[in-house]
Structure formats: structure tokens, C-alpha cells
Amino acid sequence: MWYYNNEEYKDTPEEYQGFVYEITELSTGKKYIGKKNFWRPKTLPKNSRRSRRVKTRVESDWREYYGSNVALQRLVEEHGSDGYKRVILHLCKTKGEMSYMEAKLQFMFDVLLSDEYYNEFIGCKIHSRHISKLKENF
């Protein structure tokens, strides 16, 4: 179960690409900050009605997702998901916005220096044009 603004979140909003999240292990308080897409690309094959392949998008596995950190995934598999709280911190309209907000929070909370986080690396490549909508509100 995901939470957003202290309420259970079940929507898959068309207008958002994805979100930045925090997963907390309830017994230890240890956390993980990451990002996840609501959608994944899918290419439909040619058929009798289509002479070309069509690119579309389908819902991703975000509802069951517990981060990309291997140690965290293993703990969830071994002990079950009930011991973890998943919170959406920011809904994002673009992939660039997701990458920016994820990196911003990871640096803000020193996730690589702190033993309070599962994060093991920060990877991002963001151009200012990818976050132009964020710049307008800055």
C-alpha cells in the first residue's frame, strides 16, 4: 500500500509520469529514497488493422514495487511487506522532474553518508530543459 499526503493512494493518474518515494522499515526506521514510473512503454505489433507498429504505454508494476535496492528487496521477500511503509513524496509530470527531485532529496538527506538509509548510490543526468516547469515555479 502506498500513501500520499497521509492517505492511501490507489490512482494511476494519466497526467503524471511517476513519483519520488520513501520506503521505511518500521522496526528499524531505516529508509530508502527512490523514484518509480507509473507507466512503461509498450510497442503494439502490426496486425490486419495496423500497417505500422504503434507505441503506447501501459501501467507499470508500481503497486507492488519495493525499490531497486537488492538488500531491501531481499528483506521484503524474507519478512513480508507488512513491516514497511511506502510514502509518495512528490508526483512528477516528467522523467526529468522525477530524476531531479529524487537526487535533490537524496543529497538533502545525505543518503550515502547516513546509516539511516539503504541507498548505495545516486545516479542522475538532468538537463535544465528537463525541469523547465519546475524552474517556472522556483
Predicted ranges, named:
Residues 1-138:
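Structure-specific nucleic-acid interaction/processing domains
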